[in-house]
Design a protein with these regions (language model features):
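Short, hydrophobic alpha-helix immediately C-terminal to the catalytic nucleophile
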Residues: 54-58
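Gly/Ala-rich beta-loop-alpha elbow adjacent to hydrolase catalytic centers
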Residues: 43-49, 53
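Lipolytic serine-hydrolase domain surface
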Residues: 1-40, 59-205
Length: 205
């Protein structure tokens, strides 16, 4: 519910939502920047942050604004929402200059015990599996950060598999680590040193 209210253009109570208000603020800021030094934006979202950006990006584009990059970390956004609201703007102006996703491999997602109680595993997969299986109206809803549903998507997989977007997968324990992202739990991407170096390199390049 919090993600929905933050992401929506309208809260449903007659008030503009967070995506609308933030985009309007950036539009005003961009208008104050000198022509020789335009506003440069880099967007980063972890988990539900990708849901926010999937509603924020269209608000930017509607105002003629672009983001130099969008980095999504273990994104919890549905595939259909991301396709409709973000994928079509990658490489476009206005739109998204560079798209990067860091997430876990399918094996690593299955190794991520989300819920443990008194030493016993209560839910033996990652949060993204729980979102896909229990938090969406339809069971097994395709979620962007799940490798298996990404590979099965006829639009998104070509985009991330040589189509202009960058995909960095963190493998399961015991496999060769990826130097660009090493998080082994869903909640660790935003404090994983390798992932943060990757994001910092994108922002400063």
């Amino acid at each position: 519910e919090s993600a929905r209210l933050a992401s929506s253009s309208d809260t449903g109570e007659g008030h503009p939502g967070g995506a609308f208000q933030f985009a309007a603020l950036l539009e005003a800021l961009a208008g104050m920047m000198p022509a020789a030094k335009p506003l440069e934006m880099h967007l980063v979202g972890h988990s539900a942050g990708a849901i926010f950006h999937s509603h924020f990006v269209p608000e930017l584009v509607h105002r003629g604004l672009s983001a130099a990059s969008l980095s999504v970390l273990a994104p919890a956004v549905r595939n259909d929402v991301f396709k409709a609201n973000v994928a079509k703007f990658v490489g476009k102006a206005p739109g998204i200059g560079a798209l990067t996703m860091c997430t876990m491999t399918e094996d690593a997602e299955r190794d991520d015990d989300l819920v443990e109680f008194l030493g016993a595993t209560v839910y033996g997969k990652s949060l993204l599996y729980l979102v896909s299986r229990a938090f969406e109206p339809k069971r097994k809803t395709p979620i962007l950060g799940l490798e298996e549903t990404l590979r099965a998507d006829p639009v998104l997989w070509p985009l991330f598999n040589g189509g202009g977007a960058r995909l960095e997968l963190s493998p399961a324990r015991g496999e060769t680590p990826n130097p660009h992202t090493r998080a082994l739990r869903h909640g660790c991407f935003d404090n994983d040193a390798a992932t943060m170096r990757t994001v910092a390199t994108i922002v400063t390049s």
